[in-house]
Amino acid sequence: MERIKELRNLMSQSRTREILTKTTVDHMAIIKKYTSGRQEKNPSLRMKWMMAMKYPITADKRITEMVPERNEQGQTLWSKMSDAGSDRVMVSPLAVTWWNRNGPMTSTVHYPKVYKTYFDKVERLKHGTFGPVHFRNQVKIRRRVDINPGHADLSAKEAQDVIMEVVFPNEVGARILTSESQLTITKEKKEELQDCKISPLMVAYMLERELVRKTRFLPVAGGTSSVYIEVLHLTQGTCWEQMYTPGGEVRNDDVDQSLIIAARNIVRRAAVSADPLASLLEMCHSTQIGGTRMMDILRQNPTEEQAVDICKAAMGLRISSSFSFGGFTFKRTSGSSIKREEEVLTGNLQTLKIRVHEGYEEFTMVGKRATAIIRKATRRLVQLIVSGRDEQSIAEAIIVAMVFSQEDCMIKAVRGDLNFVNRANQRLNPMHQLLRHFQKDAKVLFQNWGIEHIDNVMGMIGVLPDMTPSTEMSMRGIRVSKMGVDEYSSTERVVVSIDRFLRVRDQRGNVLLSPEEVSETQGTEKLTITYSSSMMWEINGPESVLVNTYQWIIRNWETVKIQWSQNPTMLYNKMEFEPFQSLVPKAIRGQYSGFVRTLFQQMRDVLGTFDTTQIIKLLPFAAAPPKQSRMQFSSLTVNVRGSGMRILVRGNSPVFNYNKTTKRLTILGKDAGTLIEDPDEGTSGVESAVLRGFLILGKEDRRYGPALSINELSNLAKGEKANVLIGQGDVVLVMKRKRDSSILTDSQTATKRIRMAIN
């Protein structure tokens, strides 16, 4: 207010007004500033001044033939004077208006296709909702953000090849289109842009916008997905923010979001399996996100998130050299340290072995809702400057920094025993033990930390153990700042190694990431994630495990059937039956398995007892390590829908229901697919129909290799012999007939011969 009064005062003196409005600008320094160099120093002024002239535009000479000298109002459209220094004509802005209204018309069909990104942006803005403007201090931190909504994720080189192929197909130069996305995009664009009259350079430029992710390092408070970044200038200023809901989503943001969810699910699941690294790779290879292979997305997508980076490390891709602890990304900005094992005692006199970092180091800490600068010496926090969205976020950052400092007072603040375990029931390492402990309750930690008097520093404020702000006192070495800490801007990637337990290390052996760092946050993916791996069946709960297990058996029935009769142990050990075991009550798993295996053995031994439906129904139970017992069961229990439900050994139940007439199998009322029983079940003599054109020679003969399924017989050449698995799970030797005429008689003789061959 004072300043405004002062200015008003000055302006009221007539001399001031005169100086400001009348004096010429003849100061040498000013003239120099505006005339030296080719760079325009004041583009908007230059534009206004140019447009005030009569002929500010130059055009090709041909314009004089295409545009009249005067328009209907008699205004001159172009000058007879040619432009100094070029053979172009000087043109009035009115000529542009005339051209737009009366110039030649061209087909507009390609415009929405070429300028797709612009048209889409207009649609998003049209349907977006702008809310109220709030005035408040904005804590902005610079983050690397995607500024180009709606792009594919090709590398610059891949995009260049696609653009050359689409826009300049006849140019020389080697172009290798290898990836699936490259080929699809090229084909699509070539069709769309047939007979396109828009200048090739413009098409190339617009294609680049569509194909490549462009990132900038920008100050952001709030949403970082590309549909928010495109309106950054409308939604946040230095002291204000405007609420905004985008009017549409773009695939690249959805891919980023879904990739993070898929990666988290996969890492969490892999961590609890017998061989985490092998499982993780198997799942990454067999997962699709929105119809694209996850492996392809990982190769192209620069998203940096703990789980995503673990997956990338497993694939041998480079990742950022920053490391993760407590959900914060740490980047060392100066100093160095050496690591040494040290034993420390907690407040509960429990011994912990920690790797102490000896030496002075400075780090930036960046999290979702808080950022900080941390300076530490050996087991001592020198200074922590933290900023965050709210008290809770600031507290989280302080806890992580205190644990990271490895200070003695932090370790002594532990009350009770530390025995936190990960998802696989293994003890966490000491640093994560401490972190979990204080994340649960940090009262003692803050209380014991110690407080100090503080100096009044602009933009900084103290924080007390109960998290209240103060200008006089603060926890030792800790200040809260109004300013955020920028994210690490470099896009440098380093070579890393990953061990069996998914711990990622840089080449100096520092651990950058581990499964403990993967967020437990659950979200709903924007794009469909298809996990083909049986390890992920349990992600949607017990029902999904049940349905998926039976669907898998039905899909692979032909091979399962052969294994069932010839190599049952291998079949029982298939990983696809692993998830199912969690549904079977632990105490009885072994007995069920022993019972089912015995039942199956009888089926193999006794002619005519083979029963497709029953084998499928009971097979998953045989996968557990069997306990030998004399127990017989008429029903088996599975834990779904929060309680035990029964599967009847003989007959249908709500869990497993097979309809003989429609051949449909329903699991818990959900359709699980069509089940074709073997033709011989229930009706003797039908094998012959299946074996038409084959002569049954006798019992199985191992020299002719493993048994084929009936479907595979069709590949035999005439006169070729093979073992074949017929209905009852029995194997006989057959030969494909040399002549087709005798096929009819096969039907009658086959039945007799099968009986003889088996008995």
From Swiss-Prot:
InterPro entries referenced in this protein's UniProt entry, alphabetically: Flu_PB2_2nd, Flu_PB2_6th, Flu_PB2_C, Flu_PB2_CAP-bd, Flu_PB2_middle, Flu_PB2_N, INV_PB2, PB2_helical
Protein's organism: Influenza A virus (strain A/Memphis/1/1971 H3N2)
GO biological process: 7-methylguanosine mRNA capping; cap snatching; DNA-templated transcription; symbiont-mediated suppression of host cytoplasmic pattern recognition receptor signaling pathway via inhibition of MAVS activity; symbiont-mediated suppression of host gene expression; symbiont-mediated suppression of host mRNA transcription via inhibition of RNA polymerase II activity; viral RNA genome replication
Quaternary state and interactors: Influenza RNA polymerase is composed of three subunits: PB1, PB2 and PA. Interacts (via N-terminus) with PB1 (via C-terminus). Interacts with nucleoprotein NP (via N-terminus). Interacts (via N-terminus) with host MAVS (via N-terminus); this interaction inhibits host innate immune response.
Domain of life the protein comes from: Viruses
Protein name: Polymerase basic protein 2
Function of the protein: Plays an essential role in transcription initiation and cap-stealing mechanism, in which cellular capped pre-mRNAs are used to generate primers for viral transcription. Recognizes and binds the 7-methylguanosine-containing cap of the target pre-RNA which is subsequently cleaved after 10-13 nucleotides by the viral protein PA. Plays a role in the initiation of the viral genome replication and modulates the activity of the ribonucleoprotein (RNP) complex.
Protein's cellular compartments: Virion; Host nucleus; Host mitochondrion
Major localisation: virion
Lineage of the organism: Viruses, Riboviria, Orthornavirae, Negarnaviricota, Polyploviricotina
Pfam families found in the cross-reference section: Flu_PB2_1st, Flu_PB2_2nd, Flu_PB2_3rd, Flu_PB2_4th, Flu_PB2_5th, Flu_PB2_6th, Flu_PB2_7th
Motif Nuclear localization signal, residue range(s) on this chain: 736-739
This protein's record includes keyword Nucleotide-binding: no
